[in-house]
């Protein structure tokens, strides 16, 4: 799969100094809609976009068994306290490209875990993970970071993955809005992720605290799910202090990498 086939016309590595390209994508634990492992193709796609910030959901980490050495080849040197190795998809690409990363696992199992991640080639300050689980059957979190983007302007970054039921989602939206009002100050802000919000409840709710949804503001459908034939606008990106310029959900080969299409926005940072 070539980078050219998946690249975006506006995701150029040398955009205007005050412009930002942002991507939100539910990685479906690194598997395609047909169940095949697609992580390598996902990684190639992210490399090709040259975005300034990536908001990822369902980024997967698996526990890899500790190495076992055969007798006579140093097995006696193995320490029982040696930890197993965790293979994390988001960390892999961050290390490969020398990007900054913030991780916020939501689901913890003995052999695997998954959750949110924020990646950026720009400096990141980590703000932590906030538990926004509405009930014990769906573990959800709000991942917080701050990046220095577009001429050394700090931008607050929030990555979320909301519940499947409307009642739980509404509670989570109110919690996130409360966090923003209390903790985010007045500077530029981006809130992105898989909101599971085909009813668009979030657009009005976050609009009350001064956030605009990118695709909605541009008059676009915002549909990203299911990837092979998008019918629902489950993924959202809300901004404050940034002007939306363009929205896109790529088609073609990108439709077979995850069950969601990437949500891509080109934004301009408002002048101070």
Predicted regions and their residues:
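Metal-dependent phosphoester-hydrolase catalytic domains
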Residues: 1-11, 124, 146, 174, ...
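N-terminal, active-site-proximal structural segment of metallo-dependent hydrolase catalytic domains
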Residues: 1-96, 103, 108-113, 270-272
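Beta-strand-turn-beta hairpins that frame and shape the catalytic cleft
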Residues: 10-22, 114-116, 120-125, 138-159, ...
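Active-site beta-strand/loop signature of hydrolases that rely on acidic residues for catalysis
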Residues: 21-27, 45-81, 119, 145, ...
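Surface-exposed cleft-lining segments at the edges of enzyme active sites
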Residues: 28-33, 77, 129-134, 159-167
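Catalytic-core segment of enzymes that process non-peptidic bonds
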Residues: 96-132
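Solvent-exposed loop/turn segments connecting transmembrane beta-strands
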Residues: 110-111, 135-139, 166-168, 255-257
């Amino acid at each position: 799969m070539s980078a050219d086939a998946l690249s975006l016309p506006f995701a150029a590595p040398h955009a205007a100094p005050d412009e930002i390209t942002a991507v939100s994508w539910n990685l479906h634990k690194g598997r395609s809609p047909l169940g095949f492992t697609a992580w390598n193709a996902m990684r190639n796609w992210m490399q090709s976009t040259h975005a300034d910030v990536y908001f990822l959901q369902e980024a997967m980490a698996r526990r890899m068994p500790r190495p076992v050495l055969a007798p006579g080849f140093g097995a006696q040197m193995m320490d029982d306290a040696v930890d197993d190795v965790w293979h994390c998809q988001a960390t892999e690409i961050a290390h490969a490209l020398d990007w900054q990363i913030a991780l916020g696992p939501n689901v913890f199992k003995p052999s695997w875990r998954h959750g949110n991640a924020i990646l950026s080639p720009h400096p990141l300050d980590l703000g932590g993970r906030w538990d926004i689980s509405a009930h014990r059957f769906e573990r959800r979190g709000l991942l917080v970071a701050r990046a220095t983007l577009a001429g050394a302007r700090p931008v607050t970054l929030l990555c979320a993955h909301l519940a499947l039921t409307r009642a739980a989602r509404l509670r989570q939206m109110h919690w996130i809005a409360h966090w923003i009002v209390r903790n985010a100050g007045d500077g530029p802000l981006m809130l992105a992720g898989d909101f599971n919000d085909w009813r668009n409840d979030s657009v009005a709710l976050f609009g009350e605290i001064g956030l605009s949804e990118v695709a909605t503001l541009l008059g676009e459908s915002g549909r990203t799910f299911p990837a092979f034939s998008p019918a629902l606008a489950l993924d959202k990106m809300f901004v404050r202090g940034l002007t939306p310029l363009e929205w896109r959900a790529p088609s073609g080969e990108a439709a077979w990498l995850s069950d969601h299409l990437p949500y891509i926005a080109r934004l301009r940072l408002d002048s101070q």
